[in-house]
Amino acid sequence: MTTFMNNKTKSAGFTFKQFHVSHDKCAMKVGTDGILLGAWASLQGNRYLDLGTGSGLIALMLAQRTQTDCHITGVEIDPSAYRQATENVRQSPWADKIQLEQQNIVDFTRTCTKKFDTVLSNPPYFEQGVDCRDKQRDTARYTQTLSHSDWLNLAADCLTNTGRIHLILPYAAGKNLQKQTALFCARCCEVITKSGKIPQRLLLTFSKQPCTTEQSRLVVYNEQNQYTEQFIALTRDFYLNF
């Protein structure tokens, strides 16, 4: 989903109510997917992990939403995105809450000795065979060596026994992941771009513990191409124009 809000822009980025995200050095720009995930994910515990942090958007959203004693770790493989995320964090009010690591997620999860209460990820979702002609963007978006199931299992390796994993995926990919994983789906939200359309994305929460799935639906635009009250309520704490 490539919908963008009309927030004030500076330094090729977006200014939110409490922080600014520059993204001109990042393959993946600030967009609705990441913002939805950062606003929708439930808060649990005080150790948070953002796998594939990119510009640092989700880590910064978590920092705004959580208490002062919480700690957020962001992992990013791309050197340019990592440097930009580091600068975005440094200029934010929460530099003391966020730690960034430049690693691929396989190495990070294999060497990480601590467990996290909450893991978030807006993972790659283009399958191989789609030529985007940009190596940096290729790294950020392709499912090349890791399937979504692999990605979820790596996230689970870092999770406490009672923790939660939150993802956003294309609708079909999300449905397939629900069938493939041994984890339990605690929440499933269908994201519809405009009223009357079919769902394009799934917001998903997974747990190691057995649970029933809380089903919901989120519509971004109504039939008059205006943001729905539901979407505004979810993102109100972040967008300048809400």
From Swiss-Prot:
Q: Please state the protein's primary subcellular location.
A: cytoplasm
Q: Which organism is it from?
A: Mannheimia succiniciproducens (strain KCTC 0769BP / MBEL55E)
Q: Reaction(s) catalyzed by this protein?
A: adenosine(37) in tRNA1(Val) + S-adenosyl-L-methionine = N(6)-methyladenosine(37) in tRNA1(Val) + S-adenosyl-L-homocysteine + H(+)
Which compartments is it annotated to reside in?
A: Cytoplasm
Q: Which GO terms fall under biological process for this protein?
A: methylation; tRNA processing
Pfam families assigned: Methyltransf_31
This chain's protein is named tRNA1(Val) (adenine(37)-N6)-methyltransferase
Q: What is its EC number?
A: 2.1.1.223
SUPFAM superfamilies named in the record: S-adenosyl-L-methionine-dependent methyltransferases (SSF53335)
Question: Any one cellular component term from GO for this entry?
Answer: cytoplasm
Question: Per its database record, what is this protein's job?
Answer: Specifically methylates the adenine in position 37 of tRNA(1)(Val) (anticodon cmo5UAC).
Which InterPro entries does the entry link to?
DNA_methylase_N6_adenine_CS, Methyltranfer_dom, SAM-dependent_MTases_sf, tRNA_Adenine-N(6)_MTase, tRNA_adenine-N6_MeTrfase
Keyword Transferase assigned = yes
Query: What family classification does the UniProt entry report for this protein?
Result: Belongs to the methyltransferase superfamily. tRNA (adenine-N(6)-)-methyltransferase family.
Q: Which UniProt keywords apply?
A: Cytoplasm, Methyltransferase, S-adenosyl-L-methionine, Transferase, tRNA processing
Q: Which cysteines are joined by disulfide bonds?
A: none
